Amino acid sequence: GADLRRADLSGADLFGANLRDANLRGADLRRANLSGADLRRANLRGADLRGADLDFSCWPLWCGGLAVKVCKRIAVQLAYHFCKLDCDDPEYIAARNAILDFANQFHRVGERGKLEKIDIAKAPGAGKQSGT
């Protein structure tokens, strides 16, 4: 992948860009259009994505997706996606329910639907120990 460490890409139009395996560590991606960008295995550690558009792209779920500077809009978007997981573990449901008001501020909630609390007592995993 491309070595874009500490690159100034603020405001760049990277719509649909192939950034797979790119090293974007410490890069300035503020207000960048990353809609539809391929961020698989991209290293975003320390990158600044405040104000960036990540719609229809992907968030790296490895160490390269940790410690990324984001704005509330992106945090809400990630929270909404977390809350849409199909997991019946009571600990997950408690965590999910705790952040619902935040997650429902998602900018696409009108088209995706407002999330409602799940009753832990009625969840299929109720009564089971976590991780079993």
Kindly give the residue locations of the regions a language model identified:
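Intrinsic low-complexity/IDR segments
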Residues: 1-6, 10, 15, 25, ...
